[in-house]
Amino acid sequence: MTDEDGVRAANSAFYAALEARDLDAMADVWEHSDRISVTHPGWPMLRGWAKVAGSWDAIFRNTGYIQFVLTDELVTVVGDSAWVTLDENILQSAGQTEAADELSGSKATSVNVFVRDEAEWKMVVHHASPVSAEG
């Protein structure tokens, strides 16, 4: 597997964990350190594994359904660091409902940063910014 393939696999695992709302799978994707950060759309930046994990737990508890269609994906690898830039096209429900008539769509542009930890790529930054319908 090439480095680019490894980063793509780690990035795919991140979105699979997010769609499944699986905190254990999400924990497997991330480096557990104080240097990591996450910025969810509309949230302040959170640093450190405890705050990052807490944010995913809150999102998972308050989301009934979420699906991502990723577009304009570009993977860049430089040594033991890599980043993925992409657009997230999101279909989700408000609250815990999974009813089709409760779904809404949105879009965010994202940067996911990974570092190589021995043979694995681990996420250290996820930053997602909302994109307006006009943008």
PLM features: residue spans?
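A beta-strand edge to alpha-helix "cap/lid" segment located at domain peripheries
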Residues: M1-A25, E31, R35-G135
